[in-house]
């Protein structure tokens, strides 16, 4: 067999080997003095431990500790040691899933007693005790039947094996020849590299993320090859906690949830509603300037509508159960595409009518498993900045450029930094995955590449990632917590116009199907507000801040309160969100305005009244400034107008 080894310097070495060989043996064949930093390898792109056997032609790449996959394999090894520790301390516990998540690891297990944070400390101490000696983490691979027999006393393991192993071998990890855990990842072969770790929390987690299943206990932790880097990670986690939009949302009274209303259904409080409303006003104005026509469509749609669009067949699991009344079945809409198609179809269209740009700030409902719900990031009710543009094929290039320019302008104003751009294209060799029209695909993809070059944009081509119905362009950002998300999207759809028989009359009096451009501006308001909260740590720019000015009278004299009220009314007349905070000592009130991150606080006392001016302090600054009211209003109005 022929094995191509991609060296760390990028060069390729080819070996012709007769018999099966492990990654470790191959590494030793390359160099007798094995680099101890190499801990795994990829076999045709799949991560494997060093003792995995190579049996046929393959492309191999060795993985070092500081590689991204190196962190993954270390984390999974930590999860195995944690599973072993739990079984030693609580023999009746049933280990379900040990896995990794971003730069951390976790273990889900079933145990009759709820473990406390005090017990978490004892578990960590026991792990450290176990790790004094080098523990073997041995991979054991069996047939499905053998694996089911081996794990017969663990119903969770049995279910996992049945769900994830249709054919072929199923591997488990045997830790210290005592604890056997069904594998859901790849672990290091022994514990020698596991020196620096920290258990973070013990929480509840539903089996397989489904709230209809049993609730298990989950222990989460982090680890690293370096003590210094582990400390850095812990500091970073603390910073992430302080930036978590769920924490900030509660502290700043932005939003709340209540299970009596329904899981995953966000409730915007007055402060949150101000942010949402101001964002909407800004985006509506931008869309107006870019020639969009706003529409409003029902939050319900008939099942027949979604059957015709194809969503019923391909998206049904993410839709709520239909409401059956009389002879009709209605469903809460998960998207507006079919509704906007009905608007297009409501009139006869000429080629001169296109592009037709429809926008809607649309309330949508999508079913998410309760275990996946995460604050405002993953919800069941959301409002989307949605648009569908109906264009002729020859207009695609120009319309794409307009869409991107609008997106770029909005993201710049909102201080959102683009991480990278991706262009999802079809795989021409896969004739079943994509709508079958080679000419249309080739022309569309060529046009998109040309316009991206004209805009001088760097992008990542993603072959095989296009939707069934057309190519897709995504704007990716990295949140303050390090998550990569798609913030904006431009997607071309050749298929939906055909499904709904949408046409326009061309210059030769022929009926032609338009192309639909799906344009997402900032995604949903819910997720975008979560992103903003975490990015700015709850400190909004003046124009977006829910509470812009706090007036703090030093005393309760009649003339002081009269002056404060006069300031209040004048600021409100200038559309500045202003309030008087008069209860409590002046010190406590100053602390409150800082805690609530109000951009400006005005102090009013006898001196300010006598001189007919005011003393203000900006959030985050220690020094106060004395100005006239007109100077103050001019300063703030300029900031609001310029969105700074």
Explain the meaning of each model-derived region:
Residues 1-77, 81-96, 102-644:
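NTP/phosphate- and nucleic-acid-binding module
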